Amino acid sequence: MNITVVVPVRNEEQSIRLLLQGLLEQTLAPAEIVIVDGGSTDATRRIVEEQARKHSHLHLICETDALPGKGRNVGAASAANEWLAFIDAGVSPANDWLAQLAEAVRLNSQTDVVYGSWEPVTDTFFKECAAIAYGYVPTEEVDATFIQSRAVFSSLLRRSVWLGVKGFSEELRSAEDLLFIKRIDDAGFIVSYAPKAVVRWSMQPNLWRTFRRFVTYSRHNMLAGLWKQWQASVLIRYGLLAVCAAILFGLTSWWPIITLGLFILMLMARAIVALWRNRRRYPAGVLRNSTRLFGLVPLLATIDAATIVGVAAWLVSDKLLGRPSV
């Protein structure tokens, strides 16, 4: 089975070596690896070029200001094979990742799309809390194994699927993968799962980086029209808190303190729910979970703030001023 692996990258000098090493050490070697650089200003291109000189099946395509969707489209268009595997920079595949994806096709030759699984990297306390806060809990069981939510960055599909759904949206920095998956579902392609095809996904390392990333996620999720799946609940939650604050304002001079207390209680309740939902994935005693609770509260507040800022950026820049998204 000949497979082309497509990887969109931009300014990934810190992670690209690990990704390339993982792809070059696959037990099922890809027939072709296509790296599409979207305009890196760091050493990413040089690193890929060095490896390409050593491995003839590794190719680098350079684009200018290409977002992930365009990068995947360019890579898929240049692919020499019918089967396309997608993975992202900042992600590290297990050595049998590609073999496990291909095995799903062998078991069902009618398969059009295979989704693998992914695991967040939790090598620091902050990343552990991040995984609990926004790393999705596996909810779908396949062959007695629970898998994570479907992700393009751990997938294998026929070239005809990519053509059939007209590729990825090229104007979005994020959420283009969610739209792509939705189009696949709407088109009725045959989907299989490979829960043992695992990649490891790097979380953001601190609050500031998390805030910046979620502002981008939020803005582009709005551009993609997927706000009901995310922003709606956040806006309702804080809308109700604002209503409570307005009522308290007319009743007592203590309204700021009471409102702050309600805000903290809301965050703590969500943190406790997150800990409970992740109790099997990240088991811990009372002391460890108490520590996690105090890590989760500011993290959830940061994500909520970023979500609202992203919505505001979409409203002002994209709806009112009509500026192109970046």
PLM feature segments, named:
Residues 21-30:
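Short, acidic, metal-binding catalytic loop of nucleotide-sugar glycosyltransferases
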Residues 37-46, 91:
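A conserved acidic beta->alpha catalytic loop
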Residues 63-79:
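Glycine-rich, basic loop-to-helix element that forms the pyrophosphate-binding segment
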Residues 84:
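Short aromatic/hydrophobic "clamp" motif used to bind/position activated sugar donors
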Residues 96-127, 202:
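Conserved donor NDP-sugar-binding/catalytic core segment of glycosyltransferases
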Residues 120-121, 138-157, 173, 179, ...:
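A recurrent flexible, glycine/aromatic-enriched loop bordering the glycosyltransferase active site
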Residues 169-229:
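Catalytic donor/gating beta->alpha subdomain of glycosyltransferases that bind UDP-sugars
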Residues 240-317:
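Membrane-embedded multi-pass helical conduit in multi-pass membrane proteins
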